[in-house]
Amino acid sequence: MSDVERTEFKLPEGMDLSSPPQRNQDVDAAEQQGEHDIERSLRPKSLDEFIGQPKVREQLSLVLNGAKNRGVTPDHVLLSGPPGLGKTTMAMIIAQELGSSLRMTSGPALERAGDLAAMLSNLMEGDVLFIDEIHRIARPAEEMLYMAMEDFRIDVIVGKGPGATSIPLEIPPFTLVGATTRAGMLTGPLRDRFGFTAQMEYYDTEDLTRVISRAARILEVDIDQDAAVEIGSRSRGTPRIANRLLRRVRDYAEVNGDGHIDVAAAQAALRVFDVDERGLDRLDRAVLGALIKGHGGGPVGVNTLAIAVGEEPSTVEEVCEPYLVRAGMISRTGRGRVATAAAWQHLGLEAPEGAIGGTLF
C-alpha cells in the first residue's frame, strides 16, 4: 500500500477475535408477496432475467464466470448511475450468480472505522458485501476499506493507553460491490481498488415496456401492449418509476373498472396522478412555470427556483433537474438555469426569439 498510511482503530465493544464469525441470515430477494413486498418481488433473480443494460450484463457475466472457472472470488465491482436503474438489484444478482451470501449496508451508516470492522469481521469466504451510496462513507472507514479490499486484512487496537496492542485481523476473501449516484465524489484511491466498474444508463421506452410487461405478469395484471408502451414512455427512463406507475395505474383500473388496463385507462390514471405525456410531475411543471412565467425563462439560480416552488434547493437540483436537462427543457449555464424552447412549448407557450433550442426525446 503506497498511497495511504496504515489505519488503526479501537476494537468495537462486543467484538471477540477469538470466536469464529457467525453467519447472519442471508438476504433473500424473493419474499412473500404483500403490498409492502411488491418492489422486492419484481426484482430479477439472474442476469438472464435482468432487462436492459446489455453491455453491463455482458461484461459482468465475463467477470463472474471467469472467477468461478478459476475458483477465486471476483474482483470488487463498482456500479454507478442515477437512482432507480437497478444497482441494488445487480448486487443481489451477483451474489445469486456466485451462490454467495449478500451483506448489505450503506455509506452513511459507516460513520466510524469500527462500524465497518464489525461488518467485515462477520464475513465468510466468498461473501458479497454491498455498500450503497459508497461515496458517502466516512473517511476513517474508507481508509480501513483500502486494506480490506487489497490485502483482506485490517489492524485493530485492543486495550487502552500504553498497554494497547495492535492486532492484525485476517478477513476471508470477499467481493465488495459499491453503488454510487455520484461517481465523481469517490476518492481516487477508493475508485482505483475496484477491478470492474460499470455505468448504468437510462432505459429507452422499448426496454421500459418490457419491464412493465414482466411486472404485469408477476402481479397478474391484465394490460394491453399499447398501455404498457404508454406507461413506459412516461417513466423517465427509470425502471423503478415504471414499476411504480404500473401499480398506480392498476389501482385506478381496479377501482374504476374491471382491472383491465388499456391505453385509455393508463392515460386517465396518469392524469389523476399528475404525470403528463412526457413523464413530468407536478413539481417538474412547477419548476418550469417558475422559470418561465416568473422569470421570463431565466437565467435563474437554483436557490431562487427552490423558493418559488417551496422546496429545498437540493430537491430541485437532484430530483427535478437531471430529467429536465435530459429532456432538453432546461439548460444549466454559468449564470443560472435557462428554459429552452422545448420547455416553453411544453407549457403551451410560444418561445421567445433567441430561446435556446431543445428537443424532447
Curated annotation (Swiss-Prot):
InterPro entries: AAA+_ATPase, AAA_lid_4, DNA_helicase_Holl-junc_RuvB, P-loop_NTPase, RuvB-like_N, RuvB_C, WH-like_DNA-bd_sf, WH_DNA-bd_sf
Compartments where located: Cytoplasm
Protein name: Holliday junction branch migration complex subunit RuvB
SMART domains, per the entry: AAA
UniProt note: domains: Has 3 domains, the large (RuvB-L) and small ATPase (RuvB-S) domains and the C-terminal head (RuvB-H) domain. The head domain binds DNA, while the ATPase domains jointly bind ATP, ADP or are empty depending on the state of the subunit in the translocation cycle. During a single DNA translocation step the structure of each domain remains the same, but their relative positions change.
Region Disordered: start-end pairs: 1-43
Primary gene name: ruvB
Stretch list, region Small ATPAse domain (RuvB-S): 204-274
Cross-referenced PANTHER family: HOLLIDAY JUNCTION BRANCH MIGRATION COMPLEX SUBUNIT RUVB, PTHR42848
Region (Head domain (RuvB-H)): 277-361
Reactions the enzyme catalyzes: ATP + H2O = ADP + phosphate + H(+)
GO BP field: DNA recombination; DNA repair
EC number: 3.6.4.-
Function of the molecule: The RuvA-RuvB-RuvC complex processes Holliday junction (HJ) DNA during genetic recombination and DNA repair, while the RuvA-RuvB complex plays an important role in the rescue of blocked DNA replication forks via replication fork reversal (RFR). RuvA specifically binds to HJ cruciform DNA, conferring on it an open structure. The RuvB hexamer acts as an ATP-dependent pump, pulling dsDNA into and through the RuvAB complex. RuvB forms 2 homohexamers on either side of HJ DNA bound by 1 or 2 RuvA tetramers; 4 subunits per hexamer contact DNA at a time.
Lineage: superkingdom: Bacteria
Subunit structure: Homohexamer. Forms an RuvA(8)-RuvB(12)-Holliday junction (HJ) complex. HJ DNA is sandwiched between 2 RuvA tetramers; dsDNA enters through RuvA and exits via RuvB. An RuvB hexamer assembles on each DNA strand where it exits the tetramer. Each RuvB hexamer is contacted by two RuvA subunits (via domain III) on 2 adjacent RuvB subunits; this complex drives branch migration. In the full resolvosome a probable DNA-RuvA(4)-RuvB(12)-RuvC(2) complex forms which resolves the HJ.
Gene Ontology CC annotations of this record: cytoplasm; Holliday junction resolvase complex
